[in-house]
Structure formats: C-alpha cells, structure tokens
Amino acid sequence: MNWWNSYQDAQLDQLIEEALRDSPNLAIAQARLNRAQAYTQVAGAPLQPQVSATAAAGVQRLSYNYLTPDATVLRGWNQVAQTALSMNWEIDFWGKYRSALAAATSELQASEAEQAQAVLVLTTALTASYAELARLFAQQATSQRAVEIRTQTSTLFRERFNHGLETLASVREADAKRAQAKTERLLIAEQIDLQRNRIAALLGAGPDRGRLIGAPKAAPSIKSGLPENLTMDLLGRRPDIVAARLQTQAFSSRIDQRQADFYPNINLVAFIGVQSLGLDRLSQGGSQFGAAGPAISLPIFTGGRLQGELRAAQATYDESVAIYNRTLIAALQEVADAITSIKALTGQLEQAELGLVAAREAFTMIAGRYRGGLANYIEVLIAEDIMLNSLRSVTELRARRLLLDVLLIRALGGGYQQQSQSPTANK
C-alpha cells in the first residue's frame, strides 16, 4: 500500500494515479533512467573480448614500374578476396574498466533514486495541493456560516430599529459586515477554482479536468503520526540522499578509473582468415593466414592531460561530497521543522477549540442580553467578530494537520527503499 492510501480518500487516490501516469516530469525521469541503463551496458563492454568479422572481394591491377620488379608483377586485372575474424581483448589488470563499470552502476542506481524522488515530489506536491483545497473548502463552509451569522445579526438589528430600539447606524454597520462576509465567500470560491487549476497542472491535464475535482473529505484519516524512532538510518532512505550518496560513490570510482590511465594497456590481439588471388582459390589449402599475440602501450608524454583528468575527477568527487552534505543538512532541517510544527499544532488546536467554545458562549449570552435591552449593538458585533475569528482559526489548524502530515512524509522519504546493489558494481 502506498502512503497516500492511508488517507482513505478515493478521489485523492485517483488523482495521484493520473499524475503518475501522465506527468511530464516523470516521463523525463524515466528517460534519464533509460539513458543510465544504456551507459551501464556500454561501460561493461570493454571487460569482454571484442570480436569482428570482415570480408572483401574485388579486382586490382599492380603497377609494372613501382617497387616490385617488372618480371614478377602479375599482368592485367586480377581478382582478390579475403575473409577474416579478428579479436581484441584489453586485459583489465589495473581495474580501469571495472572502475568505469562500478561508476556507471552507481550512476544507474542514482538515476533510480532520482526517479523515486521525482515520484515523491509529485505525489507530495499533489497531496499538499489537495490539502490546500480541503482547507479552502473548509474555509468556504466557515465563510458560509459567517454569512448566516452576519445575516441573523443584521436582521435582529433591523427588527429592533423598526421598533425604535436601535439606530440606523447600527443597522448599516451590521449590513456592512454581512456584505464583507459575502465578499469573503466569493474570494474563497475564486481561490478554490485556482487551486483546482493547479492540481490539474500537476496531473498534466488542462483546466477542464480541474473543474471535475470535488470537495475533499471533510476530515481525511491521518494515521502516520511521528515515527517512534527518528534515526539517521531512517533519514538515509530519502531518495534524494540516496541519489547524492550514489553519485559520490560513482565519482570515487571515476578517480580509480583515471588513476589506471597512468599504467600500461595490455591487449591480446588475434586474427585468422583466408585470402587468395582469385575467388576460386579462396577455399583451397594454403590460403589461410593469421596472427596472435599481446600488444602493450604505455603513455609516456601526454602534455599533462592525464594529470588534468585525474585532478578534475578528484575535484568532482569533492564537489559531490559537499552536495551530499548539503542535501543531508537540508533533510535534517525539513524533518526537524515538520516535527516541531506537528508537536506545536496539538497544543495550538486544543487552545483554539477551547477559545471557540468560549467565544460561542459569550456571543450567545451577549446576543440574549441585547434582545433584553441589557447590551448595546457594539458588544454584539465585537462578540460576533471574536467568535468568527475563533472559528476561522480552528478551521485553519484542523486543515493544517493534513499538510504537516504530508510534509513529514516527504521529509522522511515517503517510505522509499533502495534496491539491492548489483554485483557488477563491486570492484
């Protein structure tokens, strides 16, 4: 089961399924993974013998006035033919190609981790956007409740005004607050439409798809909570950290590869075939030819090229280590921030809910006193403002629970598990 299934929201599951299928960002990550797989195949090729076949046939005429004495030169045009198999195998004494394969394998695994990171970024971004949509719908409900309360207060003031118990100024002030509540409701409706467009873009779809997104569940099930033990091992599962570590391993292998360039290359070379003067003699005995033996080459003077390539490999490795450390520090901060906010939210929500209960009771009492002529309209409006602000605060904090849960999941890597290392990566 994927982490987002724990929210038990069928619409969210459907949206993520669409995003994973159609997102251009994931298509880019998959293309990069395919490229890394191809490079790994290329890197492993030099460890195997390279065999090729050649065949040629044609006619030739030799000069009578060149290096060969005229009396021994064949006359006229003559048919010639040759077929051969050749083999070249560079013995990897110094581990040059094993290091290259190890580097390519680490880069392939890093690409796999980067693809997982792309999935994590997409799914958490989509779920966070969905959480924002849920918050906006909750605020819309709060705004509708505010319109209803403001309307009731305005009606109450107007009734008392009609009986000569209230001033026109108080009625108009209540009407203004009702209009303000309606304006807020319209603004939230606009924000909901804009948020739907953002979600549609994450799906790789147009605005028409966004209009089909309904209201999220009123209270998505949040079960992940804080892990019992937040260890570095758990943090090390983050795909971006895994990718950075694997890139560092790859660049370390590149250093070994460049160091091997300073040592002799030892090749086993062999070829065998048949050649003849005249096609009809190609298969006759005596047409065979061949050779076999080692070939050794040693770089003597390269103008500093090998030293420069080694220094560049070492500098690239140092850079990758710094990038890994930066990624790790950023991850630690993200986890710490998410945990701090989640822990703080519990107390904030508890106090906000207590404040809402008190504000509702105060508004009810003041409204009753106002009807009995024991309170003025200003007290009613102040109590009403306090109650509505408390309601908005509680709504915001309840909606924030889902967002913080998503942020913690992203900070911890979304349950990513690196695949076992391929044995070809071992030197």
Predicted regions and their residues:
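C-terminal structured "cap/appendage" subdomains that terminate the fold
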Residues: F363-L402
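Amphipathic alpha-helical coiled-coil scaffold segments and their short linker/junction regions
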Residues: N5, L20, G76, A103, ...
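Periplasmic alpha-helical coiled-coil/stalk elements that build and connect Gram-negative outer-membrane
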Residues: Y97, A113-L230, S341, L345, ...
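Bacterial Sec-pathway N-terminal export signals of envelope proteins
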Residues: M1-Y39, F137, A219-Q249, P299-I300, ...
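Small/polar, glycine/serine/threonine/aspartate-rich low-complexity segments that form flexible
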Residues: M1-Y7, E17, A57-S86, R209-P227, ...
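Acidic, low-complexity, intrinsically disordered peripheral segments
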Residues: P207-R209, P220-I222, I339, S393-K427
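Sec/SRP-type N-terminal targeting helices
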Residues: A27-I28, G44, I91-V119, A169, ...
